[in-house]
């Protein structure tokens, strides 16, 4: 399957489902289907994110990397961001940020600390 050919933005269906929305955008799946497959509509762990992506033919880098500028990011990346409210999953794809809470952005959503894992189709 691999990474979706066209990334379409999806808002998180509830304030705790940012990870599921990122997985849905990255794979082109329906977010409710992702929730069922991941097994929770609440916060997702790194392991849940990685396992879901691998089951869809997408590899996720083994190490998280700090990032401060969008020019440091690879073509596709899953982001972990420390936002004013909580830690938050987001997606970077082809020069744009697809954030489950804030929408499609040209730069990072509001965040103090930022990390990423590169993702690639296997």
What are these regions, as identified by a protein language model?
Residues 58, 64, 112-114:
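Short glycine-aromatic motifs
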Residues 26-27, 68-70, 120-121:
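Extracellular and analogous surface-interaction loops
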Residues 35, 61-93, 101-102:
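Active-site-adjacent substructure of cysteine-protease-like catalytic cores
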């Amino acid at each position: 399957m691999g990474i979706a050919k066209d990334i379409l933005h999806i808002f998180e269906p509830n304030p705790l489902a940012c990870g599921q929305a990122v997985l849905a955008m990255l794979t082109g799946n329906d977010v409710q289907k992702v929730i069922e497959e991941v097994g929770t509509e609440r916060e997702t762990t790194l392991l849940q994110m990685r396992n879901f992506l691998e089951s869809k033919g997408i590899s996720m880098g083994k190490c998280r990397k700090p990032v401060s500028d969008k020019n440091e990011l690879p073509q596709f990346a899953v982001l972990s961001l420390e936002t004013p409210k909580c830690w938050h999953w987001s997606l970077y794809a082809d020069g744009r940020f697809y954030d489950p809470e804030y929408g499609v952005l040209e730069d990072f959503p509001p965040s103090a600390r930022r990390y990423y894992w590169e993702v690639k189709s296997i």
